[in-house]
């Protein structure tokens, strides 16, 4: 919508303009619920799934917003089996799902998936509230512990309510290998964040043996936004090329965004 100049002009006449909200803003999170409803409806329309058949959802996340939207969709009745939380090397969410303890007391790592470089996952508070039985006092206490001690732990009873979640992470090396392998196998190029999700999904299948459930991977960014990291992963020979040269490479078999095309 942000690239639709006709719609932008129409809104301008009416005195409105589009804006974007940070992922902590509930105004951004709630519309994301529609992503998963739409994806499910499209799978059903295309005959990929039967009516009421459950699917898995994989989301690359640092701030826990997009995957929380999937959680809300599931709670609203969308047939979702597993919510697969994919982290990069800043794996605070993976550790939380593995141990029940959220601990931000660790080194911050700069990765090729910068939108996920987060140690305080603000939207997780909303999930904690739900699994705490909507107990605002208990939720507040844990957030205060995070603020003062840098960590908090949930109870066994709360952990039991996370059975539908699976968490894992990929290293920088694994992320690059995922990009390269997918391109070599299919000719399709994904960005670094989507590669984290794809890599974690591979680990999920190995860990669980669940290879039959239809699965949606949320591709949260365009490879054109991270051309340097993406092309370095495919072949180091591209390292000497400029960013605009990388965008123009014919091996990227998807259309570049309109406004980027105008710049280049």
Predicted features along the sequence, with ranges:
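Active-site-adjacent helical/loop segments in soluble small-molecule enzymes
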Residues: 3-7, 12-46, 51-54, 130-208
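Structural motif
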Residues: 15-19, 55-56, 81-84, 187, ...
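Structural alpha-beta junctions
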Residues: 9-13, 78-80, 237-240
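Extended hydrophobic-aromatic, low-complexity segments
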Residues: 192, 208-213, 226-229
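Glycine-rich phosphate/pyrophosphate-binding loop at beta-loop-alpha junctions
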Residues: 48-51, 56-145, 218-234
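Single conserved hydrophobic/aromatic residue that forms the stacking wall/gate
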Residues: 252-263
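Small/polar glycine-rich anion-binding or flexible loop at a beta-alpha turn
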Residues: 194-202, 219-225, 247-250
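A hydrophobic, small-residue-rich beta->alpha segment in the mid-to-C-terminal subdomain
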Residues: 230-251
């Amino acid at each position: 919508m942000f690239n639709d100049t006709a719609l932008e002009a129409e809104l301008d006449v009416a005195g409105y303009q589009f804006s974007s909200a940070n992922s902590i803003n509930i105004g951004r999170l709630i519309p994301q619920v529609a992503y998963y409803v739409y994806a499910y409806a499209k799978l059903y329309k295309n005959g990929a799934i039967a009516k009421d058949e459950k699917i898995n959802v994989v989301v690359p996340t640092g701030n826990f917003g997009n995957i929380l939207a999937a959680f809300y969709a599931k709670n609203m009745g969308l047939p979702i089996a597993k919510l697969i939380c994919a982290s990069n090397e800043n794996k605070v969410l993976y550790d939380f799902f593995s141990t029940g303890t959220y601990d931000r007391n660790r080194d911050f790592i700069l990765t090729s998936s910068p939108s996920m470089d987060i140690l305080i996952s603000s939207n997780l508070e909303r999930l904690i509230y739900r699994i705490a039985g909507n107990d605002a006092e208990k939720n507040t206490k844990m957030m205060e512990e995070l603020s003062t001690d840098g960590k908090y732990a949930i109870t066994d009873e709360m952990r039991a309510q996370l059975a539908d979640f699976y968490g894992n992470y990929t290293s920088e090396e694994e992320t690059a290998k995922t990009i390269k392998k997918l391109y070599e196998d299919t000719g399709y190029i994904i960005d670094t964040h989507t590669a984290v999700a794809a890599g974690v999904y591979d680990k999920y299948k190995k860990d669980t043996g669940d290879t039959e459930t239809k699965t949606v991977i949320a591709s949260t960014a365009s490879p054109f936004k991270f051309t340097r990291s993406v092309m370095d992963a495919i072949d180091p020979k591209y390292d000497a090329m400029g960013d605009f040269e990388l965008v123009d490479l014919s091996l990227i078999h998807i259309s570049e965004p309109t406004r980027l095309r105008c710049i280049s």
